[in-house]
From Swiss-Prot:
Pfam families: Ribosomal_L23. Part of the 50S ribosomal subunit. Contacts protein L29, and trigger factor when it is bound to the ribosome. This is Large ribosomal subunit protein uL23. Belongs to the universal ribosomal protein uL23 family. GO terms for cellular component: ribonucleoprotein complex; ribosome. It comes from Herminiimonas arsenicoxydans. InterPro entries: Nucleotide-bd_a/b_plait_sf, Ribosomal_uL23-like, Ribosomal_uL23/eL15/eS24_sf. One of its GO terms (molecular function) is rRNA binding. The gene is rplW. The keyword Ribonucleoprotein applies. One of its GO terms (biological process) is translation.
């Protein structure tokens, strides 16, 4: 008994904030065929899956989400903290690929 959930296209366009291009994200992409995105703090796995499929025209197999706490930083005598972030590790189905380095056409 699976229910089809409709997400508004406007909401889906706002869910993905940016792709994560780092050494760890590149390693994960090569080894596990996953892509890493920064997402909105209140985004659900189903919204992330729908947003990736809508924006990049690929099929998503699964989504894992990690909440990352912001680091404590100090400037002089003032303490501060960087923002908390939420990352989505999106596993694509075999044969699917998202390439951020090629030019948009």
């Amino acid at each position: 008994m699976s229910a089809v959930i409709k997400h508004s296209e406007e909401r889906l366009m706002k869910v993905l904030l940016a792709p994560v291009i780092s050494e760890k994200a590149t390693f994960v992409a090569e080894k596990n065929e996953q892509v890493v995105f920064l997402v909105m703090p209140d985004a659900t796995k189903l919204e992330i899956k729908a947003a990736v499929e809508l924006l990049f025209k690929v099929q998503v197999e699964s989504v894992q989400v990690a909440n990352r706490q912001g680091k404590q930083k100090r400037s002089g005598r003032f303490n501060g903290r960087r923002n908390h972030t939420r990352r989505a590790f999106v596993c694509l189905k075999p044969g699917q690929e998202i390439n951020f380095t090629e030019e948009a056409k």
